[in-house]
């Protein structure tokens, strides 16, 4: 008689983690490669988005320089989308994607090499970073569209948001502590700018590893079709309005945390600590949303992100203190990925629909979508500059987020209408 064997517990943390890993393995190979690449690059983005802004603030104390840098970045992105559309006909898409990741390290190196921070040098570094983002996002969007379908895009963007949120905990906390300790303990003879250069080296190493991973993908190359058009389906123009509204928040959302924390809350250590608070819970929630929700839940998820952003802006305007910054950062840590989780799958679903209707290269929609985002970003940055010049820096930092958050709420009925039209067309 065989001895009875104890049944393995099927509710432990390790078992559940292995189960989720096996579930990940059921998805298409190219989708998994793309997610692994994005996971690695997720640890670069917080460095670029957060600490470049604080580096400019520390070495110039000019809020306008931070916004000028961001405008240069946003100007470089759509130009690169245009160039990328032509290069895709001659160069492998994985190579262009890798080039974009590597350029982010080059931009930071240019910034750190400047002996004195002047507007011209800052704009040059911003344009290079714009090239980096352009090659990265243009090819990433195309690969995401080609490697996923509407049935698995919630999972794709949920897992991607999980990576991004975990990185927003680990990277700001570690690098913020490193930069703070450099200043407090006199490491490198107290030269904090040398510490920033070591952070730039860290970025280079990660981008090289991420580039190696994406080269393993077996991605189909795009068709050499025309991608420049002026007329589009009415459904796409509605999507473009949504893109402009999304861009308005992007125009200020990247630099806002750096300016708020350096102005009201402290230094880089504080910046890293604030980003870490509550982000672990956010990461788990985002993964679960991506794992178990469907396309029918996207508008609700998107709306929740928009409401959180507006709520954070309201608290910042009302309190305008370190406490207000903490509340805003907590709202941002959860609200921003919720907006992305609801927005990007909807965008790709619309592209699938209108590209079939109009028999066009899907990159045509990815390209023009970026220009809609640029219009919004320009408005967002421009609003801050106008408020700064017309009133004061304090007024701009205090109220711009609230104004943008309220404007963003217009996106909710637009997204609901787009989803309704898509559902009707697919019946």
Predicted regions and their residues:
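Helix-loop boundary and gating motifs at the non-cytosolic
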Residues: 12-78, 235-276
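Substrate-agnostic recognition of the 12-TM MFS/MFS-like secondary transporter fold
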Residues: 33-49, 70-76, 80-84, 125-179, ...
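C-terminal ends and interior cores of transmembrane alpha-helices
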Residues: 102-117, 307-326
